[in-house]
């Protein structure tokens, strides 16, 4: 089972260049590191202890905690935390890495506790879910963050630290494309906006379309009806629902 991330406990301060940026890491600091950049920390392994988390553990943690997924524009590749009881954490990591780790439920609770240290950090859930989502799911998460943005394939590659050719290949393996994911996300957002927004021009803009006429064309092709037609159907449904409620109230009286 592949690792998703690691929790690193620093016991000796060190300076490092991670993803072309210089960082100073302090004694007693705790990091959560995406496995995609874990290799950048390898030269400094003598300065820290760590525990790795596989997909099964992350999935179970997300299910048990029931935390809502909140995405960030560019997913963080590592998170930092401080003011943690270092003595206790040191013992936890030592136990989890030892051969004495024979109580599964207890070990699992300790693993969950290590993850929860970062629960208040911005990008926490995104880092975890990016490790267990499909590639298409990761792309969808990114574009959904800001659908009004004129997304290009290169933008997504920069967020995922992956080449354009490799991203295309991985999406092809999942039987989809970047264009299809972007279109589906925008159309679903447009359909939701139509329920509350009357202006087609505004909806087109909020969904990332510079041309309203092209948005109408894309919407009709996707759903089989124009935005105005769908909006009218929603209004009729609401009126029908209100009339039904009024009738029921009258009968009750």
From Swiss-Prot:
Keywords: Activator, DNA-binding, Transcription, Transcription regulation. Residues 137-233 form the HTH araC/xylS-type domain. Transmembrane segments: none annotated. Induction: Induced by EvgA. It comes from the Bacteria. Residues 154-175, 200-223 bind DNA. The keyword Transcription applies. It holds the Pfam family HTH_18. GO terms for molecular function: DNA-binding transcription factor activity; sequence-specific DNA binding. The keyword Transcription regulation applies. Induces the expression of gadE and mdtEF. Could also regulate the expression of other genes involved in acid resistance. NCBIfam families: PRK09940.1 (NF007407). This is HTH-type transcriptional regulator YdeO. It comes from Escherichia coli O6:H1 (strain CFT073 / ATCC 700928 / UPEC).
